[in-house]
Amino acid sequence: MRRKKALIFGATGQDGSYLIDLLLKKNYIVHGVKRRGSSPNTSRLDHLYSKDSSRLRPNFYSKGSLTMHYGDLLDNSSLHRLIVDIKPDEIYNLAAQSHVKISSEIPEYTANVNGIGVLKLLEIIKSLKREKKIKFYQASSSEMFGNTLPPQNENSEFNPQSIYAISKLFAYNVVKYYREAYGLFASNGILFNHESPRRTYNFVTKKIINALKNIKEDKQKKLFLGNLYSKRDWGHAKDYVEAMWKIMQLKSPIDLVISTNSQISVKQFVNESCRQLGIRIKWVGKGLNEKAINLDNNKIIIEVKKKYFRDKEVNSLCGDFTKAKKIINWKPKYKIRELISDMISGLNID
């Protein structure tokens, strides 16, 4: 039986690394794409290799193979070369400027990477006349829903509240257009927030857990946060990459919401993280004056700062994965407590 070939853009990110894990276990020939930078970060892939070798760990990854390439969604020639040379069966586009707040500081870059980059990939597939030979997956975002009332599903109205969300909505619509106009197998996975030990420190969940651990160990005095009452549907990246793969195994392309059907606030995330870390806190004050006090020493360890609020807040995101459960037989395995526990364990490993 012929082994499938997958090409992954954004291979060194949180989702890319977990997707590589999954595909290698499924005996894929995997090609990952990373941007060339002054200090490229491939640490999320270190576990794939034997300590004293560049070869994959054979006992864990069977016959799967991984080759990394340099490329960039802003460089059309590199995209064209990769697709022509590799001839992939599946393309997963997980690459993005993914930080919502930063997107307003670099709007043109965000739009080019998140939006125009997707257009370039689909146009290359079409121009090579590989519409029937390549399956394309686009990582869409729940941020596209903005302040549309939850629960949000495939029929909910989009109402983007950031440059990031606007760029993602452009890409979402481009995928639909190329699918309907040219017959490409192009699917959108509308992913709600998903975290893991491999999440970077500039995302609020990792920021919270890392700071609280440091505070407990007297390595940090305070944690500063923005909107404590922003509610999100948080899942585990491991679950979500499985959904990506399942979407690509369908006979026809589709757009699906991937979520947990539940939500908690940033404040509740803090409370559960404190509970698991053994930090007893008490909240006092309101608004920008709200604070958390460590009951063991009466010191203020959490404060609210206006600079961490978004330009336009998205108050409540909660997905409905009913369609995904029906179409691809998917549901999340991790609950929020298990997710937080895994993230804390990941810090301990570090």
Give a label for each model feature:
Residues 1-196, 238, 244, 248, ...:
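N-terminal Rossmann-like NAD(P)+-binding domain of SDR-like oxidoreductases, especially those catalyzing
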Residues 19-25, 32-40, 60, 71-74, ...:
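C-terminal substrate-binding subdomain of Rossmann-fold SDR/epimerase-dehydratase oxidoreductases
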